[in-house]
Amino acid sequence: MQGEKHDLHHEFPEFNDTIHELKMTDNHFARLFDEYHELDHEVHRIETGAENTSDDYLEERKKTRLNLKDQLFSMLKAHAA
């Protein structure tokens, strides 16, 4: 949905404890988490009209966000297993 934030705690509520644990213990996860959070914030600002960019730029940012989300989800599942 346009303008909706996609932070990981809302996307994966079942992993809230795991997200917190990995942010504290896994530097790679923490870096990807921070990158995802910043990117999600940027996409949200663009979608709500706070920033103006081309449609191509927005789509590229969304694809990057999705790629990061997939990586983070894989790490969450692996840790929970």
Can you annotate each of these PLM segments?
Residues 1-81:
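Extended, charge-rich alpha-helical interface modules
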